Amino acid sequence: FDSVISKFENEIACFISSPFHHPTSEDNVLPKKGYWEHIQKVCNEKNIIIIVDDVRTGFRIDLAGSNKAFNFSPDLVCLGKAIANGYPISALVGKNYLKESANKVYFSGTQFFNSAPMAAAIATINELKKIDATSLMNHHGNDLKSKMISMAKSYDIDLKVTGVPSMPYFRIENKDQELHFKWVDNCLSKAVSYTHLRAHETCHN
């Protein structure tokens, strides 16, 4: 990051990133302590906009956005259908100082006046606040993680769990991954999916 900024600082408009590395079928990597604070400091100094992709992580880490948990303040945040419990809707939220620039850009869409997803989003957000959804999903995730690890140990299996509790990734550690793939296939045959990132929902218990 620093070397790129140093080399191209006058050509960089924004820094776009997910809050942490969370590919669907690989170990997740959380940011090191101070990572986002450093990104924030440099971007502020160089007048670079920070854009966070919270489509997958939005509301799972904190209802105020994943950035709150990682202690930084992005300029723009992208959110997806999770804000409406699966209804087709997305949102780009940001700081007030960007509104003037946004108003200069023509932007239109077929679904702009589709009231059902908007009503669903309001109802979903209200419900998430009411039930403290983030705490609930983290509780389920931690419970699943501890029980899965305990069960794996009883069979002398090294189960690696990465990511945040509300969306963990499970992987059996072995040299050629053969055991992991057999486990995944067997789970699928029983209608249980561990092929990729395990995203918890408040209805899971």
Language-model features, listed with the residues they occupy:
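Short beta-alpha connecting loops at secondary-structure transitions
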Residues: 75-78, 102-110, 129-132
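Active-site PLP attachment segment
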Residues: 72-101, 113-120
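Conserved PLP phosphate-binding loop immediately N-terminal to the Schiff-base lysine helix
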Residues: 14, 18-32, 48-70, 76
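Structural signature of PLP-dependent enzymes
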Residues: 124-146
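Single conserved hydrophobic/aromatic residue that forms the stacking wall/gate
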Residues: 196, 200-205
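Helix C-cap/helix->beta junction micro-motif
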Residues: 45-46, 155, 190
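Conserved PLP-binding catalytic core of the aspartate aminotransferase-like
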Residues: 141-145, 152-186
